[in-house]
Amino acid sequence: MPSLSSPTDVEIAVAQRYSAGAQEVQPALCCPVDYDQRFLAAIPEEVLERDYGCGDPSRYLVEGDTVLDLGSGAGKICFIASQVVGAAGRVIGVDLNDDMLALARGAAPVVAQRIGHRNVEFRKGRIQDLAVDLDALDGWLASHPVTDVSTLATLEAEQRRLRAEQPLVADGSVDAVVSNCVLNLVATEHKAQLFAEIFRVLRRGGRAVISDIVSTVEVPDHLRADPELWSGCISGAYQEEAFLAAFERAGFYGVHLVKRDSTPWRVVDGIEFRSVTVIAYKGKQGECRDHGQAVIYCGPFKTVLDDDEHVFPRGVPTAVCAKSFEIYSRQPYAGAFQLLEPAVAVDPATAPLFDCAPQTAPPTPTEPASVVRRAVSGLTTAGGNATTGCC
């Protein structure tokens, strides 16, 4: 069996394995998952049989969401999500494999008729490059064949045009990005771009809900070179802690491990591979402004440290910028903090930059009614950098 030596080799190995999986059920690609049975009756059996996932990110969707499913395959998660988000929501599946797309697109009208609304569409693209619509590019290539360097340059120009004028998925256009055991199929060289693309397409306040396979230690090179193991969701798996760190590097906050299987799915060369589901949020970018707000961390831990190294002692009023105040008021932090508004509201148009240094001046009338701020009478600051949008 030939070994993998490039991202193209990885893509070919995955395409061949999943094209076969579209034609005939591949049990080795399945990781047992308990789905909500209420949503399965409307889905054709040929789709259910070709479920090659390892989790159920649809459990974390809400009515009205616009959802993007990366590596949508036969469409099972999309069709479940369609029912969860309802007629007011929308679901977009993206996959590169023509055989899987044909299966999903063929099932879509059947599901729509059974549930009473049609809010699912399937698009062709690479999940690490959500700007290029490959159906549109295929159509262009049909009448503009590439035969030499000159026509290759024309192809590259068309790709740039598609990115700018007709992106497959536009910036900030979805509420939730889900994926079910697919990120590990992307070549290592393209994984950083993949996370950047997830971040790009999410709206501010949106979330990524990713189920995938992770490993206890970094996968060694000899396993990464095995096409059978790569297309089987093993060789491309993130090491467990590195998977969480990838969300942070991409700019997400509130990275939350919501499910981790205690029993490994597989053990290869002594390395455990198991399913996890992670939720991460977008929206901490931007400058920090001082609206005279504070929060109290309620416990149970003595002190907590957030992703930007802001420190919150239990029970101690802590000044925060307006952006952080908003973030701590919603998931995944809702309920962990008591929110303290100032007695006199601050005009956002004139609010100063949030000063992270200790203060020695007396409090102003904009201070919260029940506390005074920072060093003056014991109110601490969470810290950070006001000018770079630290929090």
Go through each PLM region and give its residues.
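Conserved SAM-binding loop
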Residues: 104-105
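A short acidic, Gly/Pro-enriched loop at the edge of an enzyme's catalytic core
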Residues: 133-141, 152-177
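C-terminal lobe and adjacent flexible extensions of AdoMet/dcAdoMet transferase-like proteins
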Residues: 250-391
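Short, glycine-/aromatic-enriched active-site segment of Class I SAM-dependent methyltransferases
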Residues: 214-234
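Short alpha-helix
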Residues: 236-251
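Conserved alpha-helix/loop element of class I SAM-dependent methyltransferases that forms part
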Residues: 32-66, 77-84
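A short glycine-rich, Lys/Arg-flanked "PGG" loop and its adjoining helix->strand segment in the class I
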Residues: 192-207
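Conserved SAM/SAH-binding beta-strand->alpha-helix loop
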Residues: 97
